[in-house]
């Protein structure tokens, strides 16, 4: 049996057996909400992993409806699902539970500049690593409050003096959305950027005084995603566009103060963009880009066309050595 079909069969076998409560006792555990959300994702992507089996838009809608019938809510505050004590968010369906005592969420270390930690009241070493692609941030409507909720830009200041920190290159540490690649410095041909370039991840609250990994839990699934999955399945199946539009607007109402920013009739591209804006940094982009046919596209100034083999991952050698019956995926 195909592994993806096997997985869907396994999920269907347990979907009404696992616990259905939404409580502190079920937090971090596989529940009915989590199983049905995973099924909805599989059905939404069915034409990718099993095109011979046909589209499963109605199955996706049905699975989403089960989740929508449980006691999750769209939190009035977007940040409720990303604050340090986010275990009380009723929007999170399934999460990785982190704590400072046993290691956890290390996004602050990964994204912040070496000098940014004291500016934000943190006591950690940082890597000046992850930043957002400029065109991604610029795609947001300027009135979208999720920009400020998701990306860190602007000056990083010494809290004692109020002066802007200076980077090792002698430049003010003022984070910009733009990232300017500079070539010709290294023999390997890789480009360089200035240390302050790039909007940093600001989605998970940084805890003042933090001296290790953060304890913000990471939402694998949350209800906003389910709203958008159902909306997409409705549009793809030529279903109830009014309902799809309502679902998208529930999400947009939280992000905009201006009611004119609500949609009147959503398109697939509207939903694709809404997923990009709502779910920034949450790990959904790869699936979404593959499903919408944008994953292989060139990004001018950054990368050429991605080889089609990259639509699926290679099977690690360790797995193939352990099981000679496994055949490497095409192209690897």
Tell where the protein language model's regions lie, with residue ranges.
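Acidic, serine/threonine- and proline-rich low-complexity regulatory regions
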Residues: 18-28, 76-79, 208-216
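Long, intrinsically disordered, low-complexity segments
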Residues: 6, 82-136, 210-220, 252, ...
């Amino acid at each position: 049996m195909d592994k993806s079909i096997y997985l869907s069969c396994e999920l269907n076998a347990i979907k009404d057996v696992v616990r259905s409560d939404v409580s502190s006792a079920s937090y971090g555990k596989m529940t009915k909400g989590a199983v049905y959300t995973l099924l909805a994702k599989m059905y939404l992507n069915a034409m990718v992993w099993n095109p011979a089996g046909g589209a499963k838009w109605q199955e996706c809608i049905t699975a989403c409806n089960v989740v929508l019938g449980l006691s999750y809510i769209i939190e009035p505050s977007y940040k409720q699902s990303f604050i340090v004590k986010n275990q009380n968010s009723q929007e999170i369906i399934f999460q990785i539970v982190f704590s400072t005592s046993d290691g956890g969420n290390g996004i602050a270390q990964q994204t912040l500049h070496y000098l940014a930690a004291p500016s934000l009241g943190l006591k950690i070493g940082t890597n000046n690593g992850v930043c957002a692609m400029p065109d991604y941030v610029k795609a947001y409507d300027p009135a979208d409050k999720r920009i400020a909720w998701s990306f860190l830009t602007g000056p990083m200041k010494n809290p004692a003096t109020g002066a802007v920190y200076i980077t090792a290159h002698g430049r003010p540490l003022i984070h910009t959305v733009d990232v300017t690649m500079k070539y010709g410095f290294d023999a390997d041909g890789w480009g360089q950027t200035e240390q302050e370039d790039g909007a940093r991840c600001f989605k998970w609250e940084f805890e003042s005084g933090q001296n290790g990994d953060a304890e913000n839990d990471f939402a694998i699934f949350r209800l906003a995603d389910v709203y958008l999955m159902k909306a997409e399945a409705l549009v793809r199946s030529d279903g109830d566009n009014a309902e799809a539009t309502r679902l998208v607007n529930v999400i947009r109402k939280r992000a905009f103060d201006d009611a004119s920013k609500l949609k009147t009739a959503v398109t697939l591209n509207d939903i694709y963009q809404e997923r990009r804006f709502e779910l920034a940094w949450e790990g959904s982009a790869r699936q979404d880009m593959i499903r919408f046919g944008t994953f292989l596209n060139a990004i001018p100034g950054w990368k050429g066309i991605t080889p089609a083999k990259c639509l699926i991952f290679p099977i690690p050698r360790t797995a193939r050595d352990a099981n000679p019956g496994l055949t490497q995926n095409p192209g690897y």
